[in-house]
Amino acid sequence: KHSKLPAFGSPRFAKFAVDEDPNVRGLIEAETPVVSIFGKSWDLHVHRALGITEQENLKLIGETVAYLKAHGREVVYDAEHFFDGYTANPDFALRTLEAAKSAGADVLCLCDTNGGTLTVRLMEICAEVRKRFDGVLGIHPHNDSDLAVANALAAVESGFTHVQGTINGYGERCGNANLCSIIANL
């Protein structure tokens, strides 16, 4: 009744204009009401994986969100590796959220992509983000340290209302947050 299945992909690639990027075109052609895009929020990955500047990365995020919004989509921005990125360079990690929010993202979702953020630290970071951003905030925890459910519940306790997970925690590596456990605890 309240769940929505989104199309899922990345912001445009640097070598394409947003309206010419095959991935972004595919997100539109999927005809889902919701699109979730994951963007780099750790400067390490911006430089090493994408080979672009921080400013270019912010532009990719903002242009893609704005384009999807112009096509009538609800947009969830998944800030990939947010907690590691925030630990390394909080200013840049927060600027990725600002780029998405300023372009019209409906949800800002913080991803613990490596699944290694301890719950106390996660709550501290969530509190800082909550102070800076209005609107719907979300959490996407992985279970590498066996903390995905605890971290999802901690984010909810911090005022986050959007929780991403899977049934029984199935997912890459050690899995994602187990929605069956989260729902029962809430």
Located regions from the model:
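C-terminal helical cap(s) of enzyme catalytic domains, especially alpha/beta-barrels
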Residues: 170-186
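Alpha/beta enzyme core
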Residues: 13-137, 152-160
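Generic structural hydrophobic/aromatic packing signal, biased to beta-strands
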Residues: 5-7, 68, 186
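N-terminal capping/small domains of soluble enzymes
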Residues: 1-17
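Short alpha-helical patches at coil-to-helix transitions and adjacent helical residues
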Residues: 119-122, 149, 176-180
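Short glycine/serine/threonine-rich phosphate/pyrophosphate-binding segments
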Residues: 144-150
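Structural motif
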Residues: 8, 78-80, 111-113, 140-142, ...
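Glycine-rich phosphate-binding active-site loops on the catalytic face of alpha/beta enzymes
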Residues: 39-41, 158-175
